[in-house]
């Protein structure tokens, strides 16, 4: 087991089953689209932090970890921060972006439920491997797996 990085954030790849297939929840902050995530507080477990962050950023409280509690991480951001992501399902389509009491406004300006291809186009190159990992864990076809590579 590798040591915990000095700056760890935790988040959840939140998915929802729609009529046309699985949708991924993306949140927009400034010009960046990402999955819900935030810093792990001292003494807090990463999974607990991930669940807390989803609730704080979206008010979702019905997460089901159908694919277990496995996780993947991004490479280090500046200042050594690493983001750890889990996968969870929600049945809630309507998302609320509540006001953050510290900021006095919502942390995110927009949310979208998008399919795998849409998510692939919106997320940053750093987050694309997380999206691929989640899709593979869910046994969804991805361009790489569909081509046999």
Question: What is the predicted role of each segment?
Answer:
Residues 30-33, 95-149:
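Nudix hydrolase/Nudix homology domain
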Residues 19-20, 30-33, 41, 79, ...:
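Short, charged/polar surface micro-motifs in flexible loops or helix N-caps
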Residues 1-35:
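N-terminal strand-loop-strand
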Residues 4, 25, 77-78, 102-104:
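Short secondary-structure boundary/capping segments
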């Amino acid at each position: 087991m590798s040591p915990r990085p000095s700056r760890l954030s935790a988040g959840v790849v939140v998915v929802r089953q729609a009529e046309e297939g699985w949708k991924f929840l993306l949140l927009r902050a400034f010009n960046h689209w990402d999955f819900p995530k935030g810093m792990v507080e001292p003494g807090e477990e990463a999974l607990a932090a991930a669940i807390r962050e989803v609730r704080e950023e979206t008010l979702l409280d019905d997460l089901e970890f159908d694919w277990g509690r496995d996780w993947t991480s991004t490479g280090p951001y500046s200042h050594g921060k690493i983001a750890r992501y889990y996968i969870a399902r929600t049945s809630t389509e309507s998302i609320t972006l509540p006001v953050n009491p510290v900021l006095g406004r919502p942390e995110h300006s927009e949310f979208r439920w998008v399919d795998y291809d849409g998510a692939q186009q919106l997320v940053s190159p750093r987050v694309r491997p997380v999206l691929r990992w989640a899709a593979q864990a869910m046994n969804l076809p991805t361009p790489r797996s569909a081509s046999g590579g």
